[in-house]
Amino acid sequence: MGATPRWATLSIALPEENDAWLTAFARGFFRMADQHGIELVGGDTTRGALTLSITVMGEVLPGQALRRDGAQTGDDIWVSGVIGSAALALAYRQGRLFMEQIDAARVLPALYLPTPRVELGIALRGIASSAIDISDGLLADLGHILERSQRGAQLEFAALPTLPVVQSYLHEAVARDCVLAGGDDYELCFTAPSDRGDAVQAVAHSAGVAVTRVGRITAEAGLTLIGADGQPLPYAKTGYDHFAA
């Protein structure tokens, strides 16, 4: 985390030529690339099952990258934006959760048009002690930080930032799993010393992104989820398993 994106490679496999699909894909790809100043420098095309492989490369000065192994005991845990919306939308599309259409319309954009927090990642250099994007689920991705940093965490469920429409479905177990372990949010989960809260808020404001403190790093290994009553909450699912899908 924290690098300035510079270049990308793109490899595509398609079962057959489809000019309309390629035109729409290219429009979206280059819109995002141009937004972040990324040059397409190579790749490949071939016939086969639909496959997209994109690699993005960037630059960051030595010692400034936001890694997973820098969290320290007492650090605050932060999350950018809101989480759970994309996973809730996917659960709706897959028929695992009934939603009113007006509610579904509020979360579907998070699934189809996620926003990478590039500017925030860059702004957090020198402030955050560790960072990761939430692609596999908050519990799983925070778990990667804890594993690499050899620390534990207390996470406050009531503090997790979600849209009001997501909150209205939290009585459903699948919705709670979406917030904790759904993934596809691409928000940032990061840690920072407890005395850098004002600095975190200032750079987030400059980047145009809301951030929320959701817990703290502990010396003891393990991740404890805390309920509104201050008592530990049980959880089973932690996130997407790449080799179980």
Locations of regions flagged by a protein language model:
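Short acidic/polar alpha-helix capping motifs at helix-coil junctions
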Residues: 4, 84-88, 104-110, 164-166
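Hydrophobic side chains in well-ordered alpha-helices
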Residues: 65, 120, 199-203
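Glycine-rich anion-binding loops of enzyme active sites
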Residues: 4-94, 216
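Glycine- and other small-residue-rich loops at beta-strand/loop junctions that grip anionic moieties
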Residues: 43, 69, 80-82, 109-113, ...
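Glycine-/charge-enriched secondary-structure boundary and capping motifs
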Residues: 16-39, 46-50, 57, 126, ...
